[in-house]
């Protein structure tokens, strides 16, 4: 799996950073892409990447502020002509997301050639799809804003080729049966698949947060995450000011990383008041502090393996 950032700015785009959008590539579990938020200009950012709109089969919206949704109507209509024909799409988000999309399409007389399933969240959500579990919880942003916890399926153990050759089974289609099933039959005998592969590995846990100031639900979403993606609109200055505007200060994020035992954290939604050089300078300063946890300030088009 890997995650790509198509927008890392907060509120407004800058010359260097677009508004919010994150793509989660589900390979090797599937060839699908899940998109989290679709700020203005997202489809233009995607044109500069190898991701195809037709591979996006889920869109998760954290909240209804414009820097997270203004790119939706254009992206949805373009998907009709870029590999999305007859490919179902699921859109999950706060109440109002369906009305926003359908009103935009109706008033612009836009017509899609694929079906959309809408799931609107009230307070929380437990969603299951192809072995993935997605948990959504309400955050604290002044309007309904959600964080998402994605738990990937268990990865089957690696095939022990030499052990299978030991019973006369050479590499071929049968190996997929060994990998995915508890038992397999070969030459009239039934074998336990676990005897011919390594231990299964738990899938990674990824937590992706919408805009928020510190709140209790953050911990539940972030705990023991292999990767956490969190906003830090304010990467310096007065923490009270950040919280007054229902946003997080970098110190808030650091506290969450430590309390929730997060392995790796990527910081996005950095205020548009900072240019790239200023972001880099503040990052370098924070990195020198021995008490800082493992973190990184992301830039547009950054991609990270999970």
From Swiss-Prot:
Catalyzed reactions per annotation: Endonucleolytic cleavage of RNA, removing extra 3' nucleotides from tRNA precursor, generating 3' termini of tRNAs. A 3'-hydroxy group is left at the tRNA terminus and a 5'-phosphoryl group is left at the trailer molecule
Protein name: Ribonuclease Z
The keyword Nuclease belongs to this UniProt entry's keyword annotation: yes
Pfam family, one: Lactamase_B_2
Catalytic-site annotation from UniProt: 67 (proton acceptor)
Organism field: Staphylococcus epidermidis (strain ATCC 12228 / FDA PCI 1200)
Known EC number: 3.1.26.11
Superkingdom classification of source: Bacteria
Residues the record lists as binding Zn(2+) 1: 63, 65, 141, 211
Cofactor(s) this protein cannot do without: Zn(2+)
Sorted UniProt keywords: Endonuclease, Hydrolase, Metal-binding, Nuclease, tRNA processing, Zinc
Binding site for Zn(2+) 2: 67-68, 211, 269
Role description: Zinc phosphodiesterase, which displays some tRNA 3'-processing endonuclease activity. Probably involved in tRNA maturation, by removing a 3'-trailer from precursor tRNA.
GO MF annotation list: 3'-tRNA processing endoribonuclease activity; zinc ion binding
Quaternary structure annotation from Swiss-Prot or TrEMBL: Homodimer.
């Amino acid at each position: 799996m890997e995650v790509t950032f198509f927008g890392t700015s907060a509120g407004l785009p800058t010359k260097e950073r677009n508004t919010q959008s994150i793509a989660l590539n589900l390979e090797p579990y599937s060839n699908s892409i899940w998109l989290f938020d679709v700020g203005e200009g997202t489809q233009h950012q995607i044109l500069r990447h190898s991701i195809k709109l037709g591979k996006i089969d889920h869109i998760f919206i954290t909240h209804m502020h414009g820097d997270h949704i203004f790119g939706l109507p254009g992206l949805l209509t373009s998907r009709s002509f870029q590999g999305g024909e007859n490919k179902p799409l699921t859109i999950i988000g706060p109440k109002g997301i369906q009305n926003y999309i359908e009103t935009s399409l109706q008033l612009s007389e836009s017509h899609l050639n694929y079906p959309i399933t809408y799931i609107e969240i009230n307070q929380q959500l437990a969603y299951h799809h192809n072995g993935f579990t997605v948990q959504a919880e309400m955050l604290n942003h002044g309007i309904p804003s959600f964080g998402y916890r994605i738990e990937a399926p268990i990865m089957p153990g690696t095939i022990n080729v030499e052990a299978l050759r030991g019973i006369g089974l050479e590499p071929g289609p049968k190996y997929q049966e060994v990998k995915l099933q508890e038992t397999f039959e070969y030459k009239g005998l039934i074998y336990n698949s676990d005897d011919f592969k390594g231990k299964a590995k738990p899938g990674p846990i990824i937590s992706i947060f919408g805009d928020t100031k510190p709140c209790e639900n953050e911990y539940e979403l972030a705990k023991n995450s292999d990767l956490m993606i969190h906003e830090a609109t304010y990467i310096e200055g007065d923490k009270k000011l950040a919280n007054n505007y229902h946003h997080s200060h970098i110190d808030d994020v650091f506290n969450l990383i430590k309390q929730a035992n997060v392995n790796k954290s990527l910081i996005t939604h950095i205020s548009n008041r900072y240019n790239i050089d200023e972001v880099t300078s503040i990052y370098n300063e924070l990195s020198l502090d021995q008490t800082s946890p493992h973190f990184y300030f992301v830039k547009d088009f950054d991609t990270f393996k999970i």
